[in-house]
């Protein structure tokens, strides 16, 4: 069973790419440098307190704004294991999978609280809130998208495919 388990960081609606990684830090593409500033304009303590495996839960329109790949790169480098939101900007959705960051749409995201421990069952499409005992259903990620995540993103996936075809 393919499961992601982590503690929740809670954010609201319309978290755009400038809040995820402010434009003033786009002079680098080093993931570790970006991670030092991820979400700092939304929560100044986030970069120092986020831990590997943590999960962001947000409202509508997560990742709107400019189509920078820096946003999912920064989240992933900071240790964020997944993002759950009511909806995502389409370009952020695609960029996240291309970078190997799993994201999930869940209209009931406001029922999950900051600090809750949740388990995301990728195979069965279930988010289980360990603290409340409540389960939420989502449409499972297509197999190809799961392969992108498992490979660490589109570039790594393509490299693996090239190795297999030699």
UniProtKB/Swiss-Prot annotation:
CDD domains the UniProt entry points to: IPMI_Swivel
One GO BP annotation of this record: L-leucine biosynthetic process
Organism: Nautilia profundicola (strain ATCC BAA-1463 / DSM 18972 / AmH)
Cross-referenced InterPro entries: Aconitase/3IPM_dehydase_swvl (IPR015928), AconitaseA/IPMdHydase_ssu_swvl (IPR000573), IPMI_Swivel (IPR033940), LeuD (IPR050075), LeuD/DmdB_bac (IPR011824), LeuD_type2/HacB/DmdB (IPR011827)
Keyword Ribonucleoprotein: no
First-tier enzyme category under EC: lyase
Cited Pfam families: Aconitase_C
Pathway in which the depicted protein is active: Amino-acid biosynthesis; L-leucine biosynthesis; L-leucine from 3-methyl-2-oxobutanoate: step 2/4
Domain of life: Bacteria
UniProt GO molecular function: 3-isopropylmalate dehydratase activity
Keyword line: Amino-acid biosynthesis, Branched-chain amino acid biosynthesis, Leucine biosynthesis, Lyase
Protein name per its UniProtKB record: 3-isopropylmalate dehydratase small subunit
EC number: 4.2.1.33
Gene3D superfamilies: Aconitase, domain 4
Lyase listed as a keyword: yes
Role summary: Catalyzes the isomerization between 2-isopropylmalate and 3-isopropylmalate, via the formation of 2-isopropylmaleate.
Family: Belongs to the LeuD family. LeuD type 2 subfamily.
């Amino acid at each position: 069973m393919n499961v992601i388990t982590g503690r929740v960081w809670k954010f609201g609606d319309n978290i755009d790419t400038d809040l995820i990684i402010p434009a003033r830090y786009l002079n680098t593409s080093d993931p570790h440098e970006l991670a030092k500033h991820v979400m700092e304009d939304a929560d100044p303590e986030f970069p120092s307190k986020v831990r590997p495996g943590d999960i962001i839960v947000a409202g509508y329109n997560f990742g709107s704004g400019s189509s920078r790949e820096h946003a999912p790169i920064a989240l992933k480098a900071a240790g964020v294991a997944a993002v759950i939101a009511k909806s995502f900007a389409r370009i952020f959705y695609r960029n996240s999978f291309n970078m190997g960051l799993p994201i999930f749409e869940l209209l009931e995201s406001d029922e999950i609280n900051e600090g809750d421990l949740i388990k995301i069952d990728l195979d069965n499409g279930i988010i289980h809130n360990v603290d409340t005992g409540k389960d939420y259903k989502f449409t499972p990620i297509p197999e190809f998208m799961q392969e992108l995540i498992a490979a660490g993103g589109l570039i790594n996936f393509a490299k693996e495919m090239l190795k297999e075809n030699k």
